[in-house]
């Protein structure tokens, strides 16, 4: 991941119906941020991040989703995922009072920040109401160059089916590294662990695993727990 000062993540998304036009793709911006929290500042970080997320989702029509999550094995290692309707929506967020308050507190709470620039390939979600059962997954997959297009076709179809057919699948996002198109990032949200396990037994998921088993060179599943997840829901965009 590449160091950067800014701590935001942007995506352009489509309407509730699938949108795959070149216009949408050209406007889309997506970043994934990893943040190191200073020792003893984890609770303060959660409070500031949650306040920023709540205020932004309530006040900004173009802010479509903001997710705060942490590593299970190191709660001082955080991730922030944010989704906006476009560049103008992101600019409005950066100019907002809640974002400025977050940035003002950041130096006393955060000691490391990095960003991965990515290109969104699939963005789909439902309205999320987080509770103690909600889980999320963050996964990185490296695909063999010669299988990139086939992998993309298979995984996008699987994610679309999962959202349509499974009530417990709340959000699925896929993106590729802007500097290495063969590296894929997946962020998924499920209503519960039981819903995730049911998902793994579905024909579309098992078909995806079987069809892509020889297409990849590596997979890293980052152990994460949801801290504060908010979205507007009804997002569907595939490239």
Label every PLM stretch briefly.
Residues 20-27, 67-76, 101-136, 171-181, ...:
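Glycine-rich beta-strand-turn "strand-cap" elements at beta-sheet edges
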Residues 36-47, 143-151:
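Short, surface-exposed ligand-recognition loops at beta-strand->loop->(often short) alpha-helix junctions
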Residues 44, 48-51, 101, 150, ...:
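Extracytoplasmic/secreted proteins, especially bacterial periplasmic and envelope-associated proteins
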Residues 28-36, 65-94, 132-142, 171-201, ...:
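Short, well-ordered beta-strand segments in beta-rich or mixed alpha/beta enzyme
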Residues 10-18:
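Hydrophobic h-region of N-terminal signal peptides that target proteins for export
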Residues 131-172:
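Surface-exposed interaction/gating patches
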Residues 24, 51-67, 83-116, 163-170, ...:
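An amphipathic, aromatic/His-enriched active-site/gating alpha helix that lines ligand/cofactor pockets
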Residues 2-10:
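Sec-dependent signal peptide recognition
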